[in-house]
């Protein structure tokens, strides 16, 4: 294993580690604790690690990501009585840095061997290349978390400031004041209408499947199999692909975004979306644009029949839910497309103008 010392600075090292929402513990010895996490490979990370290569898991998943292992030991207490932690970080098996940091740690809401940590007041330490541990000897987490993603949600009503959000996809929003994801989810009583084996119950996933033919990956940056990283269980799998609110219908063959779309996908899903047959569907809110969190889906889509008359959406089929702040941050940390939308909107004039 060839490892180089990273040129990362103290503040950037802290930012990298604090960008991770959930760490998985893979070893807990009396004198050593080992944590690991997986996260998307962002542009700024490439600047911190010269020639960084993507993590190549054994399963061969095509995902641009970092696999980080932290080796934690506790030196003697300082004169102030505080007990700092010595951190050796190995990134993608090729880059390393060492810190002496104050660390706050607590069990994550996922349970098991998962933790949320926060490092601060760090100092860079010499990185002894000859004594670096080999992360290839450590296991990769394999438990899929959460077992039931709805355990990280609750029923919601529109917030008092429903316009302070960005639309992530039709029927899903990032609400900035609470830093949470609001989204429409299929009611349990309606699941029997879904085709056999159907397991993605978010509004955006069902609308996309109804509108888009299969297979269709016309926009690779939204190909979730390539882009998602598991920031819940830190496995080598795609993690939150089933319930991440980033799926959007494709418009590349249908003209401008405001153009009504003709359903070309799974027609058995019609009853979940509208109370009658529709020839065209118009999205009233679009990803990356200012949004509004409504109480029902009538402000998300509009349908028209063959005679041009309006067909009401099936508002009774959907509940407005919100993810916990913890789960919302894990989704944000694991989906580069969602991160891009949220960060770009936060920097945009339309959001700042309301401050």
Swiss-Prot record:
The keyword Disulfide bond does not apply. It comes from the Viruses. Pfam families: Herpes_UL16. Keywords: Host cytoplasm, Host nucleus, Late protein, Virion, Virion tegument. Belongs to the herpesviridae cytoplasmic envelopment protein 2 family. This is Cytoplasmic envelopment protein 2. Plays a critical role in cytoplasmic virus egress. Participates in the final step of tegumentation and envelope acquisition within the host cytoplasm by directly interacting with the capsid. Upon virion binding to target cell, a signaling cascade is triggered to disrupt the interaction with the capsid, thereby preparing capsid uncoating.
